[in-house]
Each structure stands twice: as structure tokens, then as C-alpha cells.
Swiss-Prot record:
Source organism (scientific name): Methanococcus maripaludis (strain C5 / ATCC BAA-1333)
HAMAP family the record matches: HisC_aminotrans_2
Pfam families in UniProt: Aminotran_1_2 (PF00155)
Annotated InterPro entries: Aminotransferase_I/II_large (IPR004839), HisP_aminotrans (IPR005861), PyrdxlP-dep_Trfase (IPR015424), PyrdxlP-dep_Trfase_major (IPR015421), PyrdxlP-dep_Trfase_small (IPR015422)
Molecular function in Gene Ontology: histidinol-phosphate transaminase activity; pyridoxal phosphate binding
Modified sites of kind N6-(pyridoxal phosphate)lysine: 228
GO BP, sorted A to Z: L-histidine biosynthetic process
Lineage: Archaea, Methanobacteriati, Methanobacteriota, Methanomada group, Methanococci
Stated name of the protein: Histidinol-phosphate aminotransferase
Family membership noted in the UniProt record: Belongs to the class-II pyridoxal-phosphate-dependent aminotransferase family. Histidinol-phosphate aminotransferase subfamily.
Chain ranges passing through the membrane: none
Amino acid sequence: MSIDDKVRAIVKEFKAYVPGKSKEEIARNYGIDPEKIIKLGSNENPWGCSPKIAEKLMNEVSNLHQYPQPINPELMDEISKFTKMPTENIIVGGDGADEVIDNIMRILIDEGDEVIIPIPTFTQYAISAKIHGANIKWAKFDEENGFKLDVESVLNNITEKTKVIFLCTPNNPTGNVIPTEDIKKIVESTDALVMIDHAYIEYSKGEYDLTNWALKYDNVLVLRTFSKVFGLAGQRVGFGVTSKKIVDYMMRIKPIFSLTRASQVSAITALQDKEFFDRCLKEGIESREQIYNGLKKFKQLEVYPTEANYMLVKVKNGMNSSEFCEALLKKGVIVRDCYSFEGLEPYYFRISIGTFEENERFLKIMSEIVE
């Protein structure tokens, strides 16, 4: 008997997650100087993280032989101040918000339970749901209506087997927010857990931030992350805000030391450096407008309005998305080909914000490809 005979059937069906490409990969494959590559494919903060973090990490080096605190009171207090939520309603995870998603699946999903996922959206929801034995009911962000959430497609899929409903707002990769009244309708129509993914909420208008719904509704969990505005994608820190009961259940099965000492120090320092956070957010929104206005000038592209640090673009010049993205790669520009997103035709790519100088170079290269 080979190992193949022992592997779970659901795992054999899986296709590996397709992440954004790295500068190192493109430098190797195309022989381009890494310093000249423009990376606009992974929704990162192009200005990096707080410069104060480097000093704090140097001071932490002498402690790396020690296990981290399973729960860091200082980090919990800083997150509480940032979100204006009680610490007992917060759970922090390593591996970004992905750990929180996985832990929710672990405490709620039995084989044959159902989850509802509107598509196109973040692919990790489906990966985690499937590996934990859930059946997925697909709802939709309606392409013909500017990718607005089709609320009825969610409501019509709710059954007694529904355990979790995923709502990403701003949605990845489309960039649009789900109207608050639509989310309220869904939350109040079911006792299933509604996971509201706010990974990019800082870039949207304040009225769309529903983090405080974790106190208003027992069946809401709001996901947040340090990977975007805070510039800590490489440290993998995320957290959930939800009811005390759900936090208690998650703490029972949460990996004990998933958040490293370095990650904890980085997150605390990032939260304390409000000046850097505010500057990154302000310049991030300005960068988004620079790219959006620049791309709108190309008739061969359809650019979708966005409330995130990226935007979705449809190619209309006869090329598919893979051909278009390959043309950009050859010129040293990394964007995200969206062919792997369930529910999207093969003509879409996603572009993240860059520095103002990177944006100018990118738009010049775009003009060489589409005109």
C-alpha cells in the first residue's frame, strides 16, 4: 500500500493555493534586477512597517530561545485600544487571519455541514472549509452589477445545516464594500456564524467598519489583520473580534505558541506608532487614486471602483489575463492574475498600491502594452 492510499480523498482533489509572485521569483525567471521590479500583486503596504520595529526586534533577539507568551497582555491591550473593543472579545492568531478562519472551522464544522461563500472572493475560505469536511454553497458578487453582493443568493442558500457565512468587505479581489443594510439582513436572518472579513477596512469609509457588531450580535466574528496598513505581512499577525463564548471555544483548540515573540513585539510597536499608521493610510489612499485615475485613461481596460488598497481590472484588448500579466512580468511588473479566483472569467487582474514613483513607472509600462 502506498502513501497515496492513505491520503484523504478531499486532499487529493485540492489544487495548491496560488499566492502572489515574489520579486525573487521574477528576478530568477526573467533575469531582471530585483531592485527594478515593481511588486504590485500582494496587497502589501509599499512603505513597509514602522521604522521603530527594527530597534525593538534587535532588543528581542536575546530572548528568542524562550517560548512566546500564549496570550500577550500588552498586545491585547493595544488591540483593544485600537478597535475600542474589550480584550475578552478578541482572539489573536499567527499565520495572519488564516489561523482564525481555520480555528472557526475546527470548532464549528462537522462532516456534511454547510458554509456559504459568495464568489469571487478570498480563496482561503473555501480551502479551509473543504479540508474540515464542509459542503460549500456558492453565492455571488454579481459581475453584471459591478460585483455588488447578490443578497438573495446568500439568503436562498441558508438551511438548517448552515454553520458559517463568509462576507469579505471590502471584498478581495473586487475591492467593493458590502452595504451595511445587506449584511444586517443576512446576520439577522440566521443563527449561523457570519464571518465579516475586514482585512482592508482601514482603507474604506469609517461607516463601513462593523467591528463593534461583535458586541451587538452573538453570531458575528470580525476578522482583522496587521498585514495591510500596518505593513506586517511577513510577521503573520491577525485577530478576530467576536462573542466571549466563541473566543472561549477557540482558545480551547488554538495552537499554543503560534504567534512568535518577534511577531508580538512587531504588532505592539506598530499599534503604538500611530503617526506612521496615519501616514501610510493617507498616502495609501492617495496612491490608490493615482493608479485608478491613471488606468481609467486606457480604453482597453475596465477599472472597478475600490475601497481597498488594490483594484480589479478587466482586460479588453483581446488578451486574456494570463497573457496580459505575462507581458507585465517581462517588463518587471508584478500584478495578480485572477484566473485562480472561483467565479471570475479569465480576463481579470488585480493591482495593489505602490509608492508614487512605482505607480508612475507602472502606468508608463502599461501605456506601452495597451496602446
